[in-house]
Regions:
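Structural preference for well-ordered, secondary-structure-rich domains
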Residues: 1-391
Length: 391
């Protein structure tokens, strides 16, 4: 096994240009070891040496991909900055604050592109996914049952239509299973429900389109086996009173449902600490990373591409584990969760197209340049506007 690890370390050092610290290397070796142990548990016939080599290759490939992502990210961010600087200068001149506002939410006026903001783009992109999705569901005669299922969930809160609610919950279970089957054929369980298969096919078609468009805008989103829809977390249900007993209740509910790969990056003996950190994040609503949908790399604060491209923190064992957790601690129906995913994709694409892979940092850099420019011409009112809370 040591040989497999050394090969991994050498390859990663070459990829990183020799800038990895001893702590970085120790973390990488720990990652390889944890994965190798999981592979051995999952397939005892594979053998320790083969499992170690497989884990080492996987980690090496991920590190190489991360280096490519960083290079691509820098190029995209330079281009976005040039575009935004040229746009504000050409169309708003010395009214830089108005130009920044136009980029974010749009402004009234006759300036070219005054209404083409990040906000309006996000809504238009999401509509571009949802309109064709709804039309295709209608054409295949399955839209009505999804809408009825969604409406009856509201009735469930007051005890109405319990029989129909149970029927539609079963339909949603089968849709979830068929979505899982599409991305994880090896773990597929056939529901023998033609309607569920058709709905899953249509959902997956537009989810993959959203994934591809996010990649084109600057993300690096791969496919994860077993992806169903955007995971929701109801922080009120998860948090309870915010006491230790509430964490234990959540932990005991989710732990049997999680796949072992959830803990690949968790040091030995730190599982409880890891789960408590996830619970705290979900309870406070700070859970972007915990519900990130797909794979990737990146480092850096506020990096949207990192959030989009990061591997999910919570991996479920199977479709029913995902569904049962979503019923207990998520919110909304499967349809609502899917719609939420498309709305999020619209926001992500608009932000990436406007600002690049790190929108917050890109905005602050551009604003800082605008402040310097206004200061040089001693336009202190414009400086105040640029530094104001409205931006």
């Amino acid at each position: 096994m040591a040989g497999g690890y050394q090969h991994c370390i050498t390859a990663i050092q070459e990829t990183a240009g020799g800038v990895l610290s001893d702590d970085d290397l120790e973390e990488i070796v720990g990652d390889v070891q944890r994965r190798a142990r999981r592979y051995t548990r999952e397939n005892p016939l594979e053998g320790n040496e083969a499992a170690a080599l497989r884990a080492a290759k996987e980690v090496t490939d991920e590190q190489r991909k991360a280096a490519l992502i960083e290079k691509r990210s820098r190029a995209i961010n330079v281009l976005r900055k040039q575009q935004n600087l040229a746009y504000v200068t050409a169309h708003f001149g010395d009214a830089e604050s108005k130009g920044l506002q136009a980029l974010l939410v749009g402004v009234e006026g006759r300036e070219q592109g005054a209404a083409i903001s990040q906000d309006s783009q996000a809504k238009g992109i999401a509509t571009g996914f949802l309109g064709p999705l709804v039309n295709e569901l209608r054409q295949h005669g399955v839209l009505g049952m999804l809408l009825e299922s969604n409406l009856l969930r509201a009735g469930q809160l007051v005890g109405l239509f319990k029989g129909r609610v149970a029927q539609f919950k079963q339909l949603e279970r089968e849709i979830a299973q068929e979505l899982w089957n599409i991305t994880d054929p090896e773990g597929a369980i056939d529901t023998h429900n033609a309607k569920a298969k058709e709905i899953a096919r249509i959902f997956h078609k537009y989810q993959d389109l959203a994934r591809v468009q996010q990649n084109e805008a600057g993300a690096w989103i791969g496919k994860i086996p077993g992806y169903i829809v955007r995971q929701s977390h109801d922080q009120v249900k998860i948090r309870g009173r915010g006491e230790a007993a509430d964490f234990i209740r959540w932990r005991d509910a989710i732990l049997p449902k999680l796949h072992e790969k959830t803990f690949d990056d968790v040091p030995d003996g730190k599982r409880e600490e890891f789960l408590e950190a996830v619970w705290t994040a979900l309870s406070s609503g700070v859970h972007e990373h915990a519900q990130g949908d797909w794979l990737g790399g990146f480092k850096g604060p506020g990096n949207l591409a990192k959030k989009l491209s990061s591997e999910r923190v919570l991996h479920f064992k199977d479709a029913m584990s995902w569904f049962d957790y979503n019923e207990q601690y998520g919110h909304g129906s499967l349809l609502e969760s899917a719609i939420s995913g498309f709305m999020a994709a619209g926001r992500n694409i608009a932000a990436l197209r406007t600002w690049g892979t790190n929108p917050e940092a890109a905005f602050e850099r551009l604003r800082s340049e605008m402040v310097d420019r206004a200061n040089k011409r001693r336009d202190f009112k414009e400086v105040d506007r640029l530094r104001g809370d409205k931006l």
